[in-house]
């Protein structure tokens, strides 16, 4: 029987170690970066809601115009996009609300996975403009959503809420509806 060549044996071991290193290096690098506290920056257009809020756990009641109370946890997994209007929702406010509803439509077959909720005093011409075709209208009787409402007249803030009632992203007045649409397309697939 032939004895293995020591040089060939060392070369085989080096190749095996090199292959193991190729697969282990990214894992080790990720662990080092995580322990150092580095996290990749996201490209979301909305702001993170800090401290995290769960409206279902807090039992935030939103009274709908038909007398029902908004169910934060839907029967099927559905996110909720809440529009919170400032005082005197008029032309600019309605324009943003229309763009938000259009962002839902761009989700195509995933559009039913997003619910639209308008909280606050509805515009005077809400029914005439067809707003009620897309938005559920409600009131925050306890003022639990007041910290998210704008104070600027004729403006809208938006809040994206997960299907379990956890507030995910906040979009302050003057936000870009196109950025909101992009975020929705990332989250709802």
Residue ranges and their predicted role:
Residues 114-163:
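Short, internal strand/loop/helix patches
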Residues 91-131:
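Structural microenvironment flanking redox-active thiols in thiol-disulfide oxidoreductases
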């Amino acid at each position: 029987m032939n004895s293995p060549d020591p040089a060939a044996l060392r070369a085989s071991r080096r190749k095996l170690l090199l292959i193991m290193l190729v697969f282990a290096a990214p894992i080790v690098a990720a662990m080092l970066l995580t322990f150092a506290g580095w996290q990749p920056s996201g490209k979301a257009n909305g702001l993170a809601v800090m401290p995290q809020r769960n409206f279902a756990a807090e039992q935030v009641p939103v009274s709908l115009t038909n007398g029902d109370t908004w169910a934060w946890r839907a029967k099927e997994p559905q996110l909720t996009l809440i529009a919170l209007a400032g005082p005197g929702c008029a032309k600019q406010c309605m324009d943003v609300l229309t763009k938000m509803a259009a962002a839902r439509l761009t989700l195509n077959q995933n559009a039913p996975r997003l619910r639209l909720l308008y909280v606050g005093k509805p515009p005077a011409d809400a029914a005439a403009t067809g707003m009620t075709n897309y938005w559920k209208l409600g009131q925050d009787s306890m003022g639990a959503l007041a910290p998210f409402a704008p104070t600027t007249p004729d403006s809208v803030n938006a809040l994206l809420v997960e299907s379990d009632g956890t507030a995910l992203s906040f979009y302050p007045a003057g936000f870009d509806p196109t950025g909101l649409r992009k975020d929705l397309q990332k989250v709802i697939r």
